[in-house]
């Protein structure tokens, strides 16, 4: 089981990646960890924020139905999603539907935060008013249950 630590503005949570539902995309994400970026609120999507730098994940999207693995249309608090077309990762802290100015879009369901979301959601919601913050994604070593630095 691939587990990651997600850190935002001093709060860290643990998440499990969906290796069974999106094995190729999860594998590519795992390869590019640790990853750090400034994130901003996703104003059209509801309770969600997104990365501003493209993740270095190359996928042959033509091989997947809908151009992605594990396509999902709605997100609930704690969902981690990825849009291959623009290489953007997003995390829902509330009810959300990944949207662009052109409307709602299907995204790849990558994983889910397993820890208590309250403190993390509070920091994520503040992005609307405080502006960009640093997000860090790191692998968690399953043997030691420790987050490498």
What are the language-model segments listed below?
Residues 1-21:
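N-terminal intrinsically disordered, low-complexity, charge/repeat-rich segments that act as generic
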Residues 17-149:
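Glycine-rich active-site loops that engage anionic ligands at enzyme catalytic sites
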């Amino acid at each position: 089981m691939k587990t990651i630590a997600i850190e935002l503005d001093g709060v860290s949570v643990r998440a499990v990646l969906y290796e069974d539902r999106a094995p190729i995309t999860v594998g590519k994400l795992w390869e590019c960890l640790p990853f750090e970026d400034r994130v901003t609120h996703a104003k059209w999507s509801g309770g969600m924020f997104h990365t501003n730098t493209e993740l270095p994940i190359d996928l042959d999207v033509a091989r997947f139905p809908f151009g992605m693995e594990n396509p999902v249309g709605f997100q609930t608090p704690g969902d981690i999603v990825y849009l291959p077309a623009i290489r953007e990762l997003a995390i829902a802290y509330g009810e959300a539907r990944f949207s662009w100015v052109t409307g709602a879009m299907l995204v790849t369901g990558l994983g889910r935060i397993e820890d208590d979301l309250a403190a993390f959601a509070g920091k994520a919601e503040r992005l609307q008013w405080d502006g960009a913050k640093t997000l860090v994604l790191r692998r968690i070593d399953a043997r030691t249950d420790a987050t490498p630095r």
